[in-house]
Amino acid sequence: SVCRILEGCWNYSFIMGSKYGGTRSGTQWNQSFWSKEKASNFARKKDISELDYLEVDQNLLPWDDQADGAIQDAQDDVREILKRPILNLQGMSNADIKLNYGIANFEILSACDQNYTRLIRALNQWGEALYQSEKLADAESIFSYALDIGSDISSTYITLGKIYAQTDRIEQIQPLIERVKKQDFFMRDTVIDKLTGIVRSYQ
């Protein structure tokens, strides 16, 4: 997935920076990284049948057979993704996956993780399309479900906050902010600022 590619780029830049910077902490990190990476490439295959694969109750999603345009496209994307095995491995590095489940399972688990990333993106696109069409209740159900399965997409949080404000439920934004504070993703502080701004604008 994109996350896996970015991880590799980050690891490379960190290692190169450590190499030419000559810091002790960088050298230690470099040694630790390669030691873990080497060990992971010899990890034995393990049973992955009992992992917490995502099972989506499709009755929770506001399907609309009469939809067209962006809404229909997003629905179709979600339907297609739900035909595949989905697993949220956010927070695990490539080496972590191989060490925990064996290098022989790495390709299939990476695909499952990529399916998860595709799903939360498709759900966000679906929710945004519904929001733009002023179908706020349906958009809210999509965004809420996406967060329940662990989405870290910033616009999922922010647009849900906008819906709360537009439907005079501003008090529900603070719990949403507290939820964001417990997460660890790149745009966390930006999301908190945006949600706080929505509250201030409402008052």
Task: Give, region by region, the residue ranges found by the protein language model.
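Residue at a conserved register position within TPR or TPR-like alpha-solenoid repeats
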Residues: 129-130, 164, 199
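TPR repeat positional signature
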Residues: 122-123, 157
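TPR alpha-solenoid repeat register
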Residues: 155-156, 189-191
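N-terminal alpha-helical interaction modules that lie
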Residues: 2-120, 201-203
